[in-house]
């Protein structure tokens, strides 16, 4: 067998491989000899079928299987001997001429093919002990706990019927039945019976709740609204609609006394236990936000410390995924690049930079994990599946069966676990200092991004 490197351009490699007909024939004979003891042919005792006869019956299919395996094994040998890590699947070009193919299958001609690959570059890892990371820490204040409990109380507020003839006000809960039309034609999902609406909750289409102010039980109004441009249903997005709406019940919010009795309605023993639960939940939220900030700092530091050319094919794959998502979002919201003060070309350039960073960081994290034998256990993946199932009550078995039969989905669960374990490994080596901050400071970056 002869292997000749024909392309060595950056991370791209291409090889021309020649496999002698004699080598292919020998492999085919090995396969036929193995087959001899397994097949049953009329007129022959088990294991006594002549090889020549087997070759006439099964020769072409065995030759095709043998060549396929031979090519895969040969390629694996080429890559491992040279220490290549492949960025993508190899591109193999086999002979196309029909007569040449026939001669190869019949053992009359050598097999010559080419294999093109893109390799992952060698990555020299930084000294993580030189990394400095600042960890924001927020103490849970009593005022934070009080605010959290007030939000819980508001969400569990009781309502009582208003007096006969009363008019709806902001904050009231109005039970309505409605029939929606667009250009006089009813549409799917436009009808509702006895639907409770809290005026001012912003849970309905913009403008719908405002037009309920002043309505009384038994009164019917025509409410005119326009579906948002980013509405989930593309057939309704941006369209004006009218809802013939009748109020069937009107209730006013009642003051909620936050005491032991209120805590018991939530399944807790006392107000003190409710405060403890609220404080623990806030502490977990703050810790999660702090973790995100620390992780961002660490990824930025890894990005700065590992500059290399990433495989173009991986960058292109990552970019295509992001660009499809951007286009889908713009179509659903009706926004244009001009609305974002940019152009399509400028946006593409920016997202290619993001794709390059993501690919490089992914390769760096993978290299760190591999060199330090960091692995995700089956138990960790199972716990992630269980957690995902808990988020879908009543469909737990469906979720479990989905992941059990879908390796790609399971890999998507495994990836963030692996990333977090690598991050934890680096943080163990890095110089991490804690800094006391306020809640507002902790969430400032997120608030700024939301505003933007």
Curated annotation (Swiss-Prot):
Q: What is its EC number?
A: 5.2.1.8
Keywords from UniProt, A to Z, are: Cell cycle, Cell division, Chaperone, Cytoplasm, Isomerase, Rotamase
Top-level EC class as recorded in UniProt: isomerase
Q: Which reaction does it catalyse?
A: [protein]-peptidylproline (omega=180) = [protein]-peptidylproline (omega=0)
Its main subcellular localisation, reduced to a broad class, is cytoplasm
The subcellular localization recorded is:
Cytoplasm
Q: Which Pfam families match?
A: FKBP_C, Trigger_C, Trigger_N
Give the PPIase FKBP-type domain ranges.
Answer: 171-256
User: Has keyword Cytoplasm?
Assistant: yes
A GO cellular component entry from the record: cytoplasm
Q: Which InterPro entries match?
A: PPIase_dom_sf (IPR046357), PPIase_FKBP_dom (IPR001179), Trig_fac (IPR005215), Trigger_fac_C (IPR008880), Trigger_fac_C_sf (IPR037041), Trigger_fac_ribosome-bd_bac (IPR008881), Trigger_fac_ribosome-bd_sf (IPR036611), Trigger_fact/SurA_dom_sf (IPR027304)
Keyword Secreted listed? no
Looking at the UniProt entry, the stretches that span the membrane are none
Please, which domain of life does this record's source organism belong to? Bacteria
Gene3D superfamilies, per database record:
3.10.50.40, Trigger factor ribosome-binding domain (3.30.70.1050), Trigger factor, C-terminal domain (1.10.3120.10)
Q: What is one Gene Ontology biological process annotated in the Swiss-Prot or TrEMBL record?
A: protein transport
One Gene Ontology term of the molecular function aspect:
protein folding chaperone
Comment text on domains: Consists of 3 domains; the N-terminus binds the ribosome, the middle domain has PPIase activity, while the C-terminus has intrinsic chaperone activity on its own.
Q: What does this protein do?
A: Involved in protein export. Acts as a chaperone by maintaining the newly synthesized protein in an open conformation. Functions as a peptidyl-prolyl cis-trans isomerase.
Family, according to the entry, reads as follows: Belongs to the FKBP-type PPIase family. Tig subfamily.
Its recorded name reads: Trigger factor
The species this protein belongs to is Rhodopseudomonas palustris (strain ATCC BAA-98 / CGA009)
């Amino acid at each position: 067998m002869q292997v000749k490197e024909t392309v060595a351009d950056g991370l791209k490699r291409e090889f021309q491989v020649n496999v002698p007909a004699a080598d292919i024939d020998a492999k085919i004979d090995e396969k036929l000899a193995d087959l001899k003891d397994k097949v049953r042919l009329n007129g022959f005792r088990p294991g006594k079928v002549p090889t020549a006869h087997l070759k006439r019956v099964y020769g072409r299919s065995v030759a095709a299987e043998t060549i396929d395996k031979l090519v895969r094994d040969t390629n694996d040998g080429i890559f491992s001997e040279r220490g290549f890590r492949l960025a993508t699947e190899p591109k193999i070009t086999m002979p196309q001429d029909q007569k040449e193919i026939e001669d190869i299958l019949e053992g009359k001609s050598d097999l010559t093919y080419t294999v093109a690959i893109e390799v992952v570059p060698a990555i020299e890892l930084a000294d993580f002990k030189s990394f400095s990371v600042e960890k924001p820490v927020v103490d849970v204040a009593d005022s934070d706990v009080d605010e959290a409990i007030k939000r819980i109380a508001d969400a569990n507020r009781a309502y009582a019927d208003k007096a006969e003839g009363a008019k709806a006000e902001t904050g009231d809960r109005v039970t309505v039945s409605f029939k929606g039309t667009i250009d006089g034609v009813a549409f799917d999902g436009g009808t509702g019976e006895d639907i409770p609406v809290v005026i001012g909750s912003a849970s309905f289409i913009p403008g719908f709740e405002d037009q309920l102010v002043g309505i009384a039980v038994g009164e019917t109004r025509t409410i005119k609204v326009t579906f948002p441009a980013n509405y989930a249903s593309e057939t309704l997005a941006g369209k004006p609609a009218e809802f013939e709406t009748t109020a069937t019940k009107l209730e006013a919010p009642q003051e909620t006394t936050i005491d032991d009795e209120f805590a018991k309605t939530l399944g807790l023993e006392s107000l003190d236990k409710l405060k403890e639960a609220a404080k623990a939940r806030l502490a977990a939220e703050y810790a999660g936000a702090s973790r995100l900030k620390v992780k961002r700092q660490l990824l930025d530091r890894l990005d700065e410390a590992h500059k290399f050319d990433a495989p173009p094919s991986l960058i292109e794959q990552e970019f295509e995924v992001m660009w499809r998502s951007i286009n889908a979002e713009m179509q659903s919201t009706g926004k244009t690049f001009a609305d974002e003060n940019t152009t399509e070309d400028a946006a593409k350039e920016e997202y290619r930079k993001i794709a390059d960073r993501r690919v490089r960081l992914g390769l760096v994290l993978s290299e760190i994990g591999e060199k330090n034998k960091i692995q995700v256990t089956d138990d960790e993946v199972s716990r992630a599946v269980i957690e995902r199932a808990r988020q879908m009550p009543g469909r737990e078995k469906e979720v479990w069966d989905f992941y059990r039969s879908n390796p790609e989905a399971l890999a998507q669960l495994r990836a963030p676990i692996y990333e977090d374990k690598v991050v934890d490994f680096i943080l163990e080596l890095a110089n991490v200092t804690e800094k006391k901050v306020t809640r507002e400071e902790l969430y400032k970056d997120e608030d700024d991004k939301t505003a933007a």
